[in-house]
């Protein structure tokens, strides 16, 4: 509406001055519009805006601007039905031109001439550029591993630091603590550090020293020492936990019979013990910090103790599924002697399995053979091949000596959140001792990272046969209140790989599995069958009464 058409008003209702102050704007159709779409063309807008190319004058007397040689055109939506995002095309293009075939380059936007520095020499050429997705609908298709990429071999046990027998717990660490920064700090304060295991999510660490004297000295010097902007807390790692009444709860099975009363509930005095009770740490297979491993079985097996129970950890649920199909398992080297001894002296050895960070027990099985010592029978660990996107095997990073810190190496097992440093030993070439588990992967060249395909990253485990009795999942919260007197009277969910359960506690835990049959069925395969077995078909351990409350 022009100004002359505005009716004259008097007084406060005269809006002529306001109308003159407002900018004038016109609506025009696009030059190639088929009549179904309008363009809003404000006055004074830049002619280079995509979709606003003007070939006719906007104001009277203004000459036509003509076509812009470097102007990009926006395709209407009705021409984009087979494309995931709008594409921009450089150079003058009419709507009658056939649409270029972009099917061979999905998700790659096309930039016109305006992105080239010398567009005069290339009046109608465009380049493809790989670009980060700019729209929600645009994006690279998710990486889907081929069906045959699922490995039929388990990944093997995790790496653990050397256990000297003299360890301290270091707490109150800052968040995002760097491992080597802490190692350098400990070595500056005290001598004799053998290994240091960092637990980032608990803001604490375990440090092993070569002897008792250096361990005591380090504990005194590290306590209240300033690290970055905080004061550290250090305590000796003990094998026993003393209760409020002065009664010491054993950390391993004693020579007493299972019929004896369970020690009263103890009060945890170490901060790490309180952090271990959290659910997010309960299913993590943290290394044993003390040098003398927790006793996994009684020195003398009582004649009445015909059943033994152990908790075994797995790196992944897939490894357990494979064991269900094959009936074979392999454990860490420091567990082999205890399992073999239990199999020879007890009538039944029951193994309760849990995958790390799963928050539940996978199931339980019965050991039906001793561990095979024949090297030819060893089973392969770790996937046969690793792609670039699946670099989750443990890495070994050497560290050079400094003024205070000796030469060592970092073991980074990011797949399970494990990282530690240990000193380099001169006798490492003589072989791995019984206390030190075999490496989970072969040595890798840092330049190739083991990804060149010429060599396979593998290690070997000693297998034994087992019979799966149940793969009914048992969440940890259903075991609340069930404590193991052979593990400092902690809850059964807090256990390392190879922890033995007191027989009466083991029977109760298996009873919880059988009570879970009324709950929704297991999510994984069972005994190699394509379908789940009904609760009535589940086998109950021989001689056990029905589940009880």
Swiss-Prot record:
Output the InterPro entries linked to this UniProt entry. Nucleotide-bd_a/b_plait_sf, RBD_domain_sf, YTH_domain, YTH_prot
Q: Which GO terms describe its cellular component?
A: nucleoplasm
Q: Where is the composition biased (Polar residues)?
A: 49-61, 251-260, 273-289
Q: What happens when the gene is disrupted?
A: Significantly shortens the half-life time of the APHA mRNA and decreases the APHA protein expression.
Per the database entry, which stretches of residues form a coiled coil? none
Chain segments carrying region Disordered: 29-102, 139-165, 243-262, 273-298, 425-458
Residue limits of the YTH domain?
307-513
Q: Quote the Gene3D superfamilies the UniProt record gives.
A: 3.30.70.330, ph1033 like domains
For molecular function, the Gene Ontology terms on record are:
mRNA binding; N6-methyladenosine-containing RNA reader activity
Q: Which domain of life is it from?
A: Eukaryota
Q: What Gene Ontology biological process does one annotation of this record name?
A: mRNA splicing, via spliceosome
Low complexity bias: start-end ranges: 71-102
The record's annotation in PANTHER family points to:
YTH DOMAIN-CONTAINING PROTEIN 1, YTH YT521-B HOMOLOGY DOMAIN-CONTAINING
Describe the family membership recorded for this protein in Swiss-Prot or TrEMBL. Answer: Belongs to the YTHDF family. YTHDF1 subfamily.
Q: What does this protein do?
A: Specifically recognizes and binds N6-methyladenosine (m6A)-containing mRNAs, and regulates their stability. M6A is a modification present at internal sites of mRNAs and some non-coding RNAs and plays a role in mRNA stability and processing. Directly interacts with the acid phosphatase APHA mRNA to increase its stability.
Give the protein's recorded name: YTH domain-containing family protein 1
**Protein source organism:** Cryphonectria parasitica (strain ATCC 38755 / EP155)
């Amino acid at each position: 509406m022009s100004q002359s058409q505005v009716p004259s008003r008097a007084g406060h209702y005269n809006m002529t001055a306001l109308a003159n102050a407002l900018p004038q704007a016109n609506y025009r159709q696009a030059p190639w519009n088929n009549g179904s779409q309008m363009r809003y063309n404000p006055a004074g807008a830049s002619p280079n805006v995509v979709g606003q190319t003007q070939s006719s004058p906007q104001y009277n007397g203004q000459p036509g601007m003509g076509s812009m040689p470097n102007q990009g055109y926006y395709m209407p939506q009705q021409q984009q039905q087979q494309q995931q995002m709008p594409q921009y095309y450089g150079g003058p293009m009419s709507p009658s031109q056939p649409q270029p075939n972009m099917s061979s380059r999905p998700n790659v936007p096309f930039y016109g001439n305006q992105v080239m520095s010398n567009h005069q020499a290339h009046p109608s050429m465009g380049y493809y550029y790989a670009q980060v997705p700019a729209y929600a609908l645009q994006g690279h298709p998710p990486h889907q591993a081929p069906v045959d990429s699922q490995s039929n071999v388990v990944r093997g046990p995790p790496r653990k630091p050397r256990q000297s027998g003299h360890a301290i717990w270091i707490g109150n660490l800052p968040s995002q603590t760097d491992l080597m920064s802490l190692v350098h700090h400990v070595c500056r304060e005290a001598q004799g550090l053998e290994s240091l295991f960092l637990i980032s999510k608990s803001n604490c660490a375990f440090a092993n020293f070569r002897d008792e004297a250096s361990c005591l000295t380090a504990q005194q010097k590290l306590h209240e020492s300033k690290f970055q902007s905080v004061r550290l807390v250090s305590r000796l790692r003990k094998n026993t936990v003393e209760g409020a009444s002065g009664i010491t709860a054993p950390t391993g099975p004693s020579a007493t019979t299972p019929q004896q009363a369970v020690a009263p509930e103890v009060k945890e005095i170490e901060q790490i013990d309180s952090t271990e009770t959290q659910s997010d740490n309960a299913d993590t297979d943290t290394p044993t910090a003390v040098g003398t491993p927790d006793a996994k079985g009684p020195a003398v097996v009582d004649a009445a103790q015909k059943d033994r129970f152990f908790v075994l950890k797995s790196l992944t649920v897939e490894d357990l599924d494979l064991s269900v199909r094959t009936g074979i398992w392999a454990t860490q080297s420091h567990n082999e002697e205890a399992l073999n001894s239990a199999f020879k002296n007890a009538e039944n050895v029951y193994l309760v399995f849990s995958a790390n960070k799963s928050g539940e027990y996978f199931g339980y099985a019965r050991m039906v053979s001793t561990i095979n010592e024949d090297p030819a029978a060893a089973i392969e660990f770790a996937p046969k091949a690793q792609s670039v996107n699946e670099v989750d095997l443990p890495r070994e990073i050497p560290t050079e000596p400094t003024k205070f810190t000796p030469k060592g190496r970092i073991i980074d097992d990011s797949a399970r959140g494990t990282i530690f440093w240990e000193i380099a030993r001169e006798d490492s070439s003589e072989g791995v001792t019984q206390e030190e588990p075999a490496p989970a992967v072969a040595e890798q060249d840092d330049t190739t990272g083991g990804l060149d395909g010429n060599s396979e990253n593998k290690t070997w485990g000693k297998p034994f046969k087992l019979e799966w009795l149940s793969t009914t999942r048992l969440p940890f919260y259903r075991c609340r209140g069930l404590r193991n007197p052979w593990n400092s009277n902690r809850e059964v969910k807090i256990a390392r790989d190879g922890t033995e359960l007191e027989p009466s506690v083991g029977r109760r835990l298996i009873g919880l599995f059988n009570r879970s049959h009324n709950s929704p069925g297991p999510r994984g395969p069972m005994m190699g069958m394509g379908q789940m077995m009904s609760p009535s078909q589940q086998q109950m351990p021989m001689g056990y009464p029905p589940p009880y409350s």
